[in-house]
């Protein structure tokens, strides 16, 4: 996010229950949990690529509590008749944002980092610190703090906290920000800041924990002005593409789970705030 002309506050208590700093129950080790959820995330990433869904994005600037600018776009993520992934914009009124400009990094963050995945392919890029155990709604979770080991020029990373379900070993919630945050007092037009965000996931088809809701409400400190930003991103209408499609991981076909019925609620998950 660029204006016209740090580590997030991880102590922020966003879990339902108190944080228990004790180690996992033996014989399970922290490293085993990390390897399990990284493998599950790779499986999840492959599976989500076989689903259609609707993505509803709102990016707002606020003056006090009054919205004074908004970018809003609704997109259906589909497959064409040849099975290629496509995005079809179904609603996109004229943006009224004036105090910030949406950059390509913002669009990339919305697409790739708000629904953050940390697979076994990316795990070596990050420092992963076990924090403890915490109840998240009806779920027992392991909590980890995540930060990139190094910042490679031109690359973007997630930095923050994740909650991993202690039964399925899948990430069920993330809280953090995209880094690096680019400040440039001499050339404000080159600044690129983004807000801290929370993404909640819910179980789809009785198997995979897919992102369903992201919210951010944060003040960005540009060189020339402080701008309060709000993001609201909804992911809805998940449907498995094609009855004959197969999802394979390490040579094995993954289970399809139970097919979700239209209007059926997800079968479990963390609870986003009331809208």
Model segments located where?
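Structured extracytoplasmic
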Residues: 12-159, 166-173, 177-195, 203-206, ...
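Bacterial N-terminal signal peptides
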Residues: 1-8
């Amino acid at each position: 996010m660029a204006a016209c002309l740090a580590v997030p506050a991880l102590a922020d208590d966003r879990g339902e229950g108190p944080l228990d700093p004790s180690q996992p129950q033996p014989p399970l080790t922290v490293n085993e949990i990390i390897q399990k959820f990284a493998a599950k995330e790779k499986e999840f990433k492959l599976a989500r690529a076989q689903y259609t869904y609707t993505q509803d994005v709102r990016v707002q600037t606020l003056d006090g509590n009054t919205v004074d600018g908004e970018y809003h776009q609704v997109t259906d993520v589909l497959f064409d008749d040849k099975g290629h992934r496509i995005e079809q914009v179904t609603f996109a009124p004229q943006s009224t944002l004036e105090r910030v400009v949406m950059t390509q990094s913002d669009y990339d963050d919305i697409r790739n980092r708000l629904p953050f995945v940390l697979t076994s392919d990316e795990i070596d890029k990050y420092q992963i610190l076990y924090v403890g155990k915490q109840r998240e709604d009806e779920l027992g979770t392991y909590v980890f703090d995540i930060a990139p080991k190094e910042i490679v020029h031109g690359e973007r990373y997630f930095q923050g906290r994740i909650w991993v379900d202690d039964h399925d070993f899948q990430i069920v919630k993330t809280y953090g920000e995209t880094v690096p945050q680019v400040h440039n007092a001499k050339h404000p037009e080159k600044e690129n800041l983004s807000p801290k965000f929370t993404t909640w996931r819910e179980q789809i088809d009785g198997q995979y924990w897919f992102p369903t809701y992201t919210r951010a409400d944060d003040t960005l400190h540009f060189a020339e002005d402080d701008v309060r930003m709000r993001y609201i991103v909804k992911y809805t209408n998940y449907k498995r593409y094609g009855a004959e499609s197969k999802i394979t991981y390490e040579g094995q076909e993954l289970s399809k789970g139970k097919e979700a019925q239209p209007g059926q609620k997800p079968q479990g998950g963390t609870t986003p705030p009331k809208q």
